[in-house]
UniProtKB/Swiss-Prot annotation:
The keyword DNA repair does not apply. Interacts with the RNA polymerase core enzyme. GO terms for biological process: DNA-templated transcription initiation; response to heat. The lineage of its organism: Bacteria, Pseudomonadati, Pseudomonadota, Gammaproteobacteria, Enterobacterales. Residues 228-280 are annotated as: Sigma-70 factor domain-4. This is RNA polymerase sigma factor RpoH. A motif (Interaction with polymerase core subunit RpoC) lies at residues 77-80. It comes from Citrobacter freundii. SUPFAM superfamilies: Sigma2 domain of RNA polymerase sigma factors (SSF88946), Sigma3 and sigma4 domains of RNA polymerase sigma factors (SSF88659). HAMAP family: Sigma70_RpoH.
């Protein structure tokens, strides 16, 4: 990420209401406008194009951040972290993939906010493993009361989240534990002390469905991509997955050429043809 893009991502949110009004005032981009800007950024490194892409998607960061209001953290801070995720997504977005930026960026936005919540919600980090993180961000959605789960509820949650009953009990205990502050306040008024987030985890005012999911953009794009992939032959599917969809272990043209016993140029041609078919199917 360039320094200029970092500065834009880390810009102070300031007054929250004013910021949200400003974010919502930016016009949304059409698919053609978005693609043109993404191509300028991807192929030419055009920072003005990046800025427009970012500003036109700030409203979606606000929608995502509202879903985390129940953790007792400042909304402005959550939004700012989400903006960092948006910046990372814009930097990595490839217009040739054929999906809208919002569908690609929502995962990066959530990832940054998740990390921020885990770092700041408690002094002691409550979720360190993949299973614990899954529990941390889903337990509040399934918890029906503020007391302890009974055994039937523990087993139900464990089944729904694909974890063990022991994991559920352990995370419930961690989330219910009280933190000790390092600097005790001189003010003895109990009303001045912040309440533990566990007391208001059931946040009824936040509904992400009113944001991105209400428009169904992410699901729509994902379904179109899935159906489009099914229309490709097995080799083309493998090439697209290896070159575009496997974020952690992307293959080079030469690696795929060695796998299939063809030239790297042939793999490039197959990739180009497959991408063309995917775009046609998605835009249909």
């Amino acid at each position: 990420m360039t320094k200029e893009m970092q500065n834009l991502a880390l810009a102070p949110v300031g007054n929250l209401e004013s910021y949200i009004r400003a974010a919502n005032a930016w016009p949304m981009l059409s698919a053609d406008e978005e693609r043109a800007l993404a191509e300028k950024l991807h192929y030419q490194g055009d920072l003005e194009a990046a800025k427009t892409l970012i500003l036109s998607h700030l409203r979606f960061v606000v929608h995502v951040a509202r879903n985390y209001a129940g953790y007792g953290l400042r909304q402005a801070d959550l939004i700012q972290e989400g903006n960092i995720g948006l910046m990372k997504a814009v930097r990595r977005f490839n217009p040739e993939v054929g999906v809208r930026l919002v569908s690609f960026a929502v995962h990066w936005i959530k990832a940054e906010i998740h990390e921020y919540v885990l770092r700041n919600w408690r002094i002691v980090k409550v979720a360190t493993t993949k299973a614990q993180r899954k529990l941390f961000f889903n337990l509040r959605k399934t918890k029906q009361r503020l007391g302890w789960f009974n055994q039937d509820e523990v087993e139900m949650v464990a089944r729904e989240l694909g974890v063990s009953s022991k994991d559920v009990r352990e995370m419930e205990s961690r989330m219910a534990a009280q933190d000790m502050t390092f600097d005790m306040s001189s003010d003895d008024e109990s009303d001045s002390q912040p309440m533990a987030p566990v007391l208001y985890l059931q946040d009824k005012s936040s509904n992400f469905a009113d944001g991105i999911e209400e428009d169904n953009w992410e699901d729509q794009a994902a379904n179109k991509l899935t159906h489009a992939m099914e229309g490709l032959d097995e080799r083309s599917q493998d090439i697209i997955r290896a070159r575009w969809l496997d974020e952690d272990n992307k293959s080079t043209l030469q690696e795929l050429a060695d796998r299939y016993g063809v030239s790297a140029e042939r793999v490039r041609q197959l990739e180009k043809n497959a991408m063309k078919k995917l775009r046609a199917a998605i835009e249909a």
